[in-house]
């Protein structure tokens, strides 16, 4: 413990103990106290001579909310994170999986409601990435679907911070699994559209005439408050009033 105190608190010290317990330690412990002390001393010198690890951002898809639907890679990223910057829709059960010492930052957004500005989120990513932290940017569903991912990647790229993407199960896939349906069906539809119910200007506009055609299938995200608007636009463009619609929440 006294040797590890020579290293700065946080990732450097955690890396030291990981290397000891999973490599140097097991090899030395069978030979007694002196080999263990020597192994600790040698490992400490090695870690003190290392350059500080660069910060890194993992853009992680948190899935639809059930922690059992997280990927193993997402679970590992949470376990190794120094900082977790998470969205409003991330469930408490998933947040519980983050490393206990991690700094947790809520950057929740809500359509037509209080939200953290995107510029603030970008600044947080850059700030913690430049500090050398391993950052998890935790987004609900899949990070690449309606998550403003490109803007955040551009922000960290502009400052030379490394990043990678961990995909997650998108809400549309989880929703149809819950109700025992599929997004595509032979003889019914050869394509499916992912749409958003609202954008930065308000209710989102789409190619309503195309969507109103028979056999079209769409998964509409963030569509609860815009449901009447969407219904009206589809009917205006000739949609059959008997077209089936399924609403899935939580």
Regions found by a protein language model. Name each.
Residues 142-214:
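Class I SAM-dependent methyltransferase SAM-binding "motif I" and its flanking Rossmann-like core
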Residues 72-80, 98-103, 151-155, 180-182, ...:
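Short, solvent-exposed amphipathic alpha-helical segments in soluble enzyme
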Residues 102-109, 160-164, 183-193, 238-247:
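Short hydrophobic/aromatic-enriched beta-strand-loop microsegments
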């Amino acid at each position: 413990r006294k040797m590890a105190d020579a290293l700065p608190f946080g990732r450097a010290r955690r890396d030291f103990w990981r290397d000891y317990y999973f490599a140097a330690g097991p090899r030395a412990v069978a030979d007694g106290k002196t080999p263990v002390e020597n192994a600790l001393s040698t490992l400490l010198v090695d870690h003190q001579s290392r350059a500080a690890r660069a910060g890194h951002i993992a853009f992680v898809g948190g899935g639809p909310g059930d922690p059992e639907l997280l990927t193993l890679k997402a679970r590992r990223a949470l376990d190794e994170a120094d900082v977790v910057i998470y969205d409003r829709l991330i469930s408490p059960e998933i947040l519980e999986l983050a490393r206990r010492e991690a700094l947790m930052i809520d950057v929740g957004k809500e359509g037509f409601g209080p939200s953290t500005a995107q510029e603030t989120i970008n600044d947080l990513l850059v700030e913690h990435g430049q500090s050398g932290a391993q950052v998890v940017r935790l987004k609900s569903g899949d990070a690449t679907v309606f998550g403003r991912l490109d803007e955040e990647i551009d922000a960290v790229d502009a400052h030379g911070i490394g990043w990678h993407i961990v995909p997650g199960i998108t809400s549309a896939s989880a929703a149809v699994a819950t109700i025992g349906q599929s997004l595509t069906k032979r003889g019914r539809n050869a394509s499916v559209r992912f749409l958003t119910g609202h954008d930065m200007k308000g209710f989102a506009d789409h190619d309503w005439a195309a969507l109103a055609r028979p056999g079209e299938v769409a998964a509409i995200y963030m569509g609860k408050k815009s449901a009447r608007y969407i219904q009206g636009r589809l009917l205006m463009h000739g949609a059959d009033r008997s077209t089936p619609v399924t609403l899935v929440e939580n």
